[in-house]
């Protein structure tokens, strides 16, 4: 055992060098030391020669000194998995951070696992109904698929994720795992309390100090944590989700935000002595992303459906970080600042968002044709906007005037009040059934609702509500 102990030789920020005597820990092994009375975990990243390894620290390195003893655990970071994690908050190394005592785990599992083999994967296509009109109609999510939510700062990615957790937990009742990767601690705290309020999780204070009966496990590595924690916390969350999947569950895995995973990797990359690639990102960007994304998949045992918020630096979709994640996704939901500026929420761009599920073979002809007609109408309106800006509406043909009027109604009907946003908007949230969504938009593009004013379609659920609102507006005007 004695030869498994090394000593710290150098500390540079989050990167720590440890020298061993003869024994050399494997790459990705977890090493442990105590820093001012707290357990500190280091993960081996490189072998430097002369029995020295370079490691990434999973917590703050202030207080570490040269010569401090470090022990090799002989395995990657191990985290608790199973039903005991539900309703609890843990950090990257599996320690509880919610002050409710230790997590009673069925087992522990290493955070680095191989991706399921080709033979283990399942490939059937089925859509996951979210109750959000714009998503279900134009870019539907695949059950067991990967979904990316793209958007700049402040266009509503986190609110959309919270609404999805809320809707799917209510409609589908399965387990969820939420990985908070490098996002705001306040939002993490809000999410925990909102989950208790919406009965997704149980309040331990009213449940005899236990979170039993909860539906969602939370794994946090927030903005204030060192890059090591932010670069690994997504893997910790995924490990918890994989365990539920292997037990035959359909799991929802939420990551907010996958960009911070890449960002953390780029922060430690330079300290590890790697030559940066485009825009200063790590040269291993695609490999890191692939190692995470290939594990998020549906097997013959169960499924993982993942929804990942992806921050787009400076609203530039060609930035290497968002671009690296595009290749892995089944559906992309792009949030647009220009739509948010019109006050239309969720600010999903109906022409930029895509899904491989948008096919008549999967959705049926009625849904597919309605979605395509909606996109055609919006695309025509977009093409006419330059003419309208220069010459005004009067110069358009009668046909184009009708198209513009319908497109403006469609734009407004794509908005919807959310349950989790009730506190901001004051209007109760709406969950819209898929057949109501299709019927409503089909009527709109066919001109059945041309008589209603466009305000009637703003922030309503189903078409019945829009008709009701139209009557109310007409009565007020009279």
From Swiss-Prot:
Superkingdom of the organism of origin: Bacteria
Topology in the lipid bilayer: Peripheral membrane protein
Main location: membrane
Ranges in coiled-coil conformation: none
Keyword Membrane (UniProt): yes
Residues where ATP binds: 151-158
Subcellular location: Cell inner membrane
InterPro entries in UniProt: AAA+_ATPase, ATP-synt_VA_C, ATP_synth_F1_bsu, ATPase_a/bsu_AS, ATPase_alpha/beta_chains, ATPase_F1/V1/A1_a/bsu_N, ATPase_F1/V1/A1_a/bsu_N_sf, ATPase_F1/V1/A1_a/bsu_nucl-bd
Catalytic activity as recorded in UniProt: ATP + H2O + 4 H(+)(in) = ADP + phosphate + 5 H(+)(out)
SMART domains (alphabetical): AAA (SM00382)
Swiss-Prot/TrEMBL keywords: ATP synthesis, ATP-binding, Cell inner membrane, Cell membrane, CF(1), Hydrogen ion transport, Ion transport, Membrane, Nucleotide-binding, Translocase, Transport
Pfam families, sorted: ATP-synt_ab, ATP-synt_ab_N, ATP-synt_VA_C
Any Gene Ontology CC annotation: proton-transporting ATP synthase complex
Annotated EC: 7.1.2.2
Keyword Cell inner membrane on entry: yes
GO molecular function ontology, one term from the record: ATP binding
Family the entry assigns: Belongs to the ATPase alpha/beta chains family.
PANTHER family named among the record's database cross-references: ATP SYNTHASE, ATP SYNTHASE SUBUNIT BETA, MITOCHONDRIAL
Assembly and oligomerization: F-type ATPases have 2 components, CF(1) - the catalytic core - and CF(0) - the membrane proton channel. CF(1) has five subunits: alpha(3), beta(3), gamma(1), delta(1), epsilon(1). CF(0) has three main subunits: a(1), b(2) and c(9-12). The alpha and beta chains form an alternating ring which encloses part of the gamma chain. CF(1) is attached to CF(0) by a central stalk formed by the gamma and epsilon chains, while a peripheral stalk is formed by the delta and b chains.
Chain's role: Produces ATP from ADP in the presence of a proton gradient across the membrane. The catalytic sites are hosted primarily by the beta subunits.
Protein name in the entry: ATP synthase subunit beta
Origin species: Xanthobacter autotrophicus (strain ATCC BAA-1158 / Py2)
Lineage: Bacteria, Pseudomonadati, Pseudomonadota, Alphaproteobacteria, Hyphomicrobiales
Gene of this entry: atpD
């Amino acid at each position: 055992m004695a030869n498994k102990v090394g000593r710290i030789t150098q500390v540079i920020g989050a990167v720590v060098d440890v020298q061993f005597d003869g024994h050399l820990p494997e790459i990705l092994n977890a090493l442990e030391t105590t820093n001012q009375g707290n357990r500190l975990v280091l993960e081996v990243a490189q072998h430097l020669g002369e029995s020295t390894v370079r490691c990434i620290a999973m917590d703050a390195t202030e207080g570490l000194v040269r010569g401090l003893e470090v022990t090799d655990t002989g395995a990657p970071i191990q985290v608790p998995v199973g039903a005991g994690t539900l309703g609890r908050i843990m950090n990257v190394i599996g320690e509880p951070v919610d002050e409710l005592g230790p997590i009673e785990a069925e087992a522990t599992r290493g955070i680095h696992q191989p991706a399921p083999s080709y033979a283990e994967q399942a490939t059937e296509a089925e859509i996951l109904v979210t109750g959000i009109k714009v998503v279900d109609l134009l870019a539907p999510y695949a059950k067991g698929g990967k979904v990316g939510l793209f958007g700049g700062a402040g266009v509503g990615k986190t609110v959309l994720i919270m609404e999805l957790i809320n809707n799917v937990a209510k409609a589908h009742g399965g387990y969820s795992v939420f990985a908070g990767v490098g996002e705001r601690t306040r939002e993490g705290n809000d999410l925990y309390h909102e989950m208790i309020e919406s009965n997704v999780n149980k309040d331990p204070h009213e449940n005899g100090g236990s979170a039993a009966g909860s539906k969602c496990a939370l794994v946090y590595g927030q903005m204030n944590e060192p890059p090591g924690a932010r670069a690994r916390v997504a893997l910790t969350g995924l490990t918890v989700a994989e365990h539920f999947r292997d037990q035959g569950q359909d799991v929802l895995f939420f990551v907010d935000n996958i960009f911070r995973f890449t960002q953390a990797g780029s922060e430690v990359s330079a300290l590890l002595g790697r030559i940066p690639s485009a825009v200063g990102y790590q040269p291993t960007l695609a490999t890191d992303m692939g190692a995470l994304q290939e594990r998020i998949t549906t097997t013959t045992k169960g499924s993982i459906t993942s929804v990942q918020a992806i921050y787009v630096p400076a609203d530039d979709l060609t930035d290497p970080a968002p671009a690296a994640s595009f290749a892995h996704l089944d559906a992309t939901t792009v949030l647009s600042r220009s739509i948010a500026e019109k006050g239309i929420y969720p600010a999903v761009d109906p022409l930029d968002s895509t899904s491989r599920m948008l096919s008549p073979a999967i959705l049926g002809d009625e849904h597919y044709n309605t979605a395509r007609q909606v996109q055609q109408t919006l695309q025509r309106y977009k093409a006419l906007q330059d003419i309208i800006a220069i010459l005004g509406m009067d110069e358009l043909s009668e046909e184009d005037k009708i198209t513009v009027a319908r497109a403006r109604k469609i734009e407004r009907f794509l908005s919807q009040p959310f349950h989790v946003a009730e506190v901001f908007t004051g209007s109760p949230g709406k969950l819209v059934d898929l057949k109501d969504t299709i019927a409503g938009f089909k009527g709109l593009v066919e001109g059945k609702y041309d008589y209603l004013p466009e305000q009637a379609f703003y922030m309503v659920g189903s078409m019945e509500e829009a008709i009701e609102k139209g009557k109310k507006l007409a009565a007020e005007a009279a």
